């Protein structure tokens, strides 16, 4: 609560056009907000790759931890772009020879999940939890207790992908995301919202304790339905009451229906759309 981090792309969006040698980098600026009504600049640093969201950032005991993705997957004109891979950087505030405040890299773990990108991340104390995805979702459990040598302790592959990670304590994680599209657990079906409960208390052997799918919700034999939850991309729509172990998330369902009826020997056909908003309550102890 005493540190504010601001992240920006180090280059304008067009900077790499026509130059395949340059890679994306990210600037990180740290500010001390411990004193009420006052903000003090603490230092800046730069890492390789791009940062997904605020949960890929963390400050813990004076160190800045960042999860990023590198690669040239968005350069469609290249015949052989660099593959994606993921990283965890640990930065520490220091001063350079000119006396300027900087954030210096003191630890780095690279090569995580080649050809995949980060879909969600969460730093909890001396641990980091990262979800990557290509065809199936690996959950990575990373030990940050030694800043100079962050280490992968465990990995678990599960169907679908988690887009938000909510720590429950004791190494348990409650996640929301997208369910798989294929029977073998691969791919993504964007009409399926999926909740998962992980147990990573044994960091070297994380397990999936429970999973539940929430959509589509409309059951119909003469049409189709499609549903999603805003909580899959907006964490403020994910509300968890720890005392009762109760999760509340919104659901939006869209359905198409059609029907044919015979009245006085004539056939009448009707079709249309239904839009339903629901608040889903889930026992997630």
Regions found by a protein language model. Name each.
Residues 1-285:
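Feature marking well-ordered beta-strand scaffolds used for ligand recognition
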């Amino acid at each position: 609560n005493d540190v504010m981090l601001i992240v920006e792309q180090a280059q304008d969006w067009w900077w790499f056009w026509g130059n395949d040698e340059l890679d994306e980098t990210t600037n990180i600026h740290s500010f001390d907000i411990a004193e009420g009504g006052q903000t003090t600049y603490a230092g800046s640093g730069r890492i390789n790759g791009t940062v997904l969201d605020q949960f890929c950032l963390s400050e813990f005991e004076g160190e800045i931890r960042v999860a990023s993705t590198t690669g040239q997957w968005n350069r469609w004109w290249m015949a052989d772009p660099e593959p994606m891979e993921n990283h965890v950087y640990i930065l520490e505030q220091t001063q350079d020879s000119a006396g300027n405040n900087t954030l210096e890299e003191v630890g780095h773990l690279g090569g995580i999940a080649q050809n995949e990108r980060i879909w969600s991340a969460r730093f909890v104390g001396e641990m980091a939890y990262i979800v990557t995805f290509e065809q199936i979702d690996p959950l990575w459990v990373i030990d940050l207790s030694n800043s100079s040598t962050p280490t992968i302790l465990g990995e678990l592959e599960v169907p679908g992908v988690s887009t938000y990670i909510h720590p429950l304590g004791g190494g348990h994680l409650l996640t929301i995301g997208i369910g798989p599209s294929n029977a073998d657990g691969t791919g993504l079906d964007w009409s399926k919202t999926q909740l998962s409960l992980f147990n990573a208390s044994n960091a070297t052997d994380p397990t999936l304790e429970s999973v539940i799918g929430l959509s589509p919700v409309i059951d119909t034999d003469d049409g189709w339905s499609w549903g999603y939850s805003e909580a899959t991309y907006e964490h403020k729509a994910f509300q968890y009451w720890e005392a009762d172990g109760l999760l509340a998330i919104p659901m939006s369902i869209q359905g198409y229906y059609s029907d044919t009826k015979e009245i006085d020997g004539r056939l009448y056909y009707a079709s249309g759309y239904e839009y339903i908003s629901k608040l889903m309550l889930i026992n997630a102890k």
